[in-house]
Amino acid sequence: MITIQDCLTLSADKLPQLNALFESEYRPAAEQRGMSLIETRLSPPLPLQREAVNLWLRWQVTDVGAWWGMRAMAGTPEVAAFWQKVDALCESRERFYPQDLQQLELVAAQDTAAFQVQTRGHRETAQLALREGISDADVKALRDALNRAAELPGVEAVSVAENLAPEYAAGHYTFDLLFDSRASADAARASQIWTQHIAPALDQHCCAVHAQAMDTIGAGLRAAELSGAIKRTAFFRLLPGTDRDRAQRFEADLLEMPAQIPQILNWRLSRAEPLPWHRSDDAPWTYVWEQEFASLDDLLGPYMTHPHHWSHIDRWFDPESGIQAVDARLSHAFSPLSESLITREAVRGE
């Protein structure tokens, strides 16, 4: 069982209104999402006149799979509207995931300092969304054009990979380019290969191109010889009004993931900057978070089920957590990786 603990701080005179709101607009739908209400407690156990009180709601879901199912159903307008009403009544709220310490197998985080690297050159990554109804022949034409990126001046590495579950991503393909410098990338976009082959193919066959330049925040390399693997490319955007302190806390939490989850072999967190060939009506992305895994099982198994992921990191994305700072509309792309891109750009520190 997984325990979910909501703590809501509010004036005692608003408790009846809040309880009625939960019973009428949240609890029935929560039960349909697999959440069972176990108990409701108040601390201190009396209505204070001059101070707020804390209302504690304890829920349970059966397991991690049920938890992810519950989270997948949280991003509805009805859930968002409910929590807006709650926020109007409360001074603060936060969701926690306390578990029975006696039943936990606590595993110390790994020290990843020896694996940390800097990056060189200039890398660009893009999510390519195909036009609806595109034919197999047109997909092949697009891939052929993208593969010609290997002929661009100054390019050092090119990867064109089909996303395995594009419904979770901003595109059907992940397109990566490594140049020796930003100046080389700019020159490449003026070259004949780009202007006469790649750019026209993108315009013709893609309804959106989420193309980002990457400015490294932190990177690490556990498996330099990694090949025949899986690359996860995630795009995130901070919510409007998120201050720098909260952004840095989010970044630090992401960069702790490899220490907690050893299946993340190589990683790179970068600030995102839209490129001249970016084409999308969506709000700009803030981050690119790349992870390289030995296998798809490592991504879908230990990575998704690790408590550091679902009980800690996910709260930054969850509108029910009370601490959300990242838009839940993220891009989660994962695709085959022939060889490590992070290895190609890594520079070991002195």
Describe the residue ranges of each PLM region:
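Short S/T/G/P-rich N-terminal loop/turn motif that feeds into the first structured element of a domain
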Residues: 1-80, 84-196, 200-311, 326-350
